[in-house]
Structure formats: structure tokens, C-alpha cells
A protein has these predicted regions:
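Conserved phosphotransfer cores of two-component systems
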Residues: 25, 45-48, 70-76
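Hydrophobic alpha-helical motif in two-component signaling modules
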Residues: 41-44, 53, 67
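Non-catalytic signal-transmission and effector/linker regions of two-component phosphorelay proteins
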Residues: 1-3
């Protein structure tokens, strides 16, 4: 069973991603959510996350900076970057 973290500042997008994951049939133990990279980094420091979906553009800390900072962590999740940015 996998633990998933969704990092997205727009609530509707977070809910959509969560719904798609739940309908995928992949065995998921926990789906966690947060709305910025700072909070995500704190979660990643405290909990082993298997898969992370992250937006690129977010307030406080964007997805690019989050991915750069998490490289120093002991466990680095499989990361999927998502964005509506043109």
C-alpha cells in the first residue's frame, strides 16, 4: 500500500487529483494534501511518502524549489510535476 502526497494550491485541482487516484484501482493506504511547498517539505521530513504529485507554481515555495530541497532528505518519493502554466 502506498502513501501519496498531493501538493497543489488550488483546492479544486487537489480534489480532482485525489479522485483520479482513488478511482485508479492502485492500492493506496493514505492520501495526504497540502497547498504549498513549505508544508510539503515538513511532511516529507516527518513521514515516508511513496509518491508525490506537485504543482509547479505555488505561493511560499514552488514545486521546483520543493524538488531541489527534498534532494537532501533520506527518502525521496517518486515525484510527478503538474502544472497549468503555459
Amino acid at each position: 500500500m502506498k502513501t501519496v502526497l498531493i501538493v497543489e494550491d488550488e483546492k479544486m485541482i487537489r480534489q480532482g487529483i485525489k479522485t483520479m487516484i482513488m478511482r485508479s484501482g492502485v492500492p493506496i493506504e493514505t492520501i495526504m494534501e497540502c497547498n504549498n511547498g513549505e508544508t510539503a517539505l515538513e511532511i516529507l521530513k516527518e513521514q515516508e511518502i511513496d509518491v508525490m504529485f506537485t504543482d509547479i507554481r505555488m505561493p511560499k515555495m514552488d514545486g521546483i524549489e520543493l524538488v531541489q530541497k527534498m534532494q537532501s532528505l533520506e527518502h525521496i518519493p517518486l515525484t510527478v510535476a503538474i502544472s497549468g502554466y503555459d
